[in-house]
Design a protein with these regions (language model features):
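N-terminal, polar/charged subdomain of small-to-medium soluble alpha/beta proteins
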Residues: 1-99
Length: 99
């Protein structure tokens, strides 16, 4: 699976990038038909504490799954986004098995 990591207006350090890849690769254990993923990191509205935004798009057969979460840290936002995607993947996997 190909994992693309992009950031808006800042550079991602290697520690955060490796954490992102690790979390996304764990999703492929749950559902093996993930073709690729795009992760976008943003700093949104710098006047608030919860200004770190993580958007994750998983390309799978049929539809794409998407999650966007905002938090105090990128790590926390990434955790929330991957948790949401786990739920979406489980739901999608159930639909595929019914067909």
């Amino acid at each position: 699976m190909k994992i693309n990591v992009n950031s808006v207006k800042f550079k991602v350090d290697s520690k955060l990038e490796s954490l992102i890849k690790e979390k996304i690769e764990k999703l492929s254990v749950l559902y093996d038909s993930i073709l690729s993923s795009d992760v976008i990191l943003k700093l949104d509205n710098t006047s608030t504490i919860d200004n770190k935004v993580v958007e994750v798009r998983l390309a799978i057969k049929g539809n794409d799954l998407f999650s966007k979460k905002q938090s105090k840290t990128f790590d926390e936002a990434l955790d929330n986004a991957t948790d949401a995607l786990k739920k979406q993947l489980t739901k999608h996997k159930g639909k595929v098995k019914k067909i």
